[in-house]
């Protein structure tokens, strides 16, 4: 049995395919994720699993250099923003963009996976940009 934190085979596979600058997204239950082979639906019910728990686990196996967050999270979900910032290392750039731009980035060829959680708080979405480990 696998020893590392990510047990979900689809998430593990998506992370293993990442190269420098590739993207992986973690989304709340309401984000309109394209129905394609990159969709990884973990949502079981409201708040299960929580966005922040999935993010924390993914970060144990993924090297990131930048994250994208919706500008709207600053006012609509300051508590979630604070929790995200606790998990992101100081050397990782945080870029705030319009929520509409985030939706478009889900379709990018650089995006290797869209993870849907059961999160039901507004703007609980993040795009992780992969870095190299050397």
Curated annotation (Swiss-Prot):
Catalysed reaction equations from the record: beta-D-ribopyranose = beta-D-ribofuranose
Main subcellular localisation: cytoplasm
Highest taxon listed in the record's lineage: Bacteria
EC number: 5.4.99.62
Keywords per UniProt: Carbohydrate metabolism, Cytoplasm, Isomerase
Localization terms from the record: Cytoplasm
EC class of the enzyme, as a word: isomerase
Residues forming the catalytic site: 20 (proton donor)
Family assignment from sequence similarity: Belongs to the RbsD / FucU family. RbsD subfamily.
Subunit and partners: Homodecamer.
GO biological process assignments: D-ribose catabolic process
This protein's name: D-ribose pyranase
Organism, scientific name: Staphylococcus epidermidis (strain ATCC 12228 / FDA PCI 1200)
Amino acids binding substrate: 28, 99, 123-125
Any Pfam family matching the protein: RbsD_FucU
Annotated GO CC locations: cytosol
PANTHER family linked: D-RIBOSE PYRANASE
Matching InterPro entries: D-ribose_pyranase, RbsD-like_sf, RbsD_FucU
GO molecular function: D-ribose pyranase activity; intramolecular lyase activity; monosaccharide binding
Pathway of action: Carbohydrate metabolism; D-ribose degradation; D-ribose 5-phosphate from beta-D-ribopyranose: step 1/2
Function: Catalyzes the interconversion of beta-pyran and beta-furan forms of D-ribose.
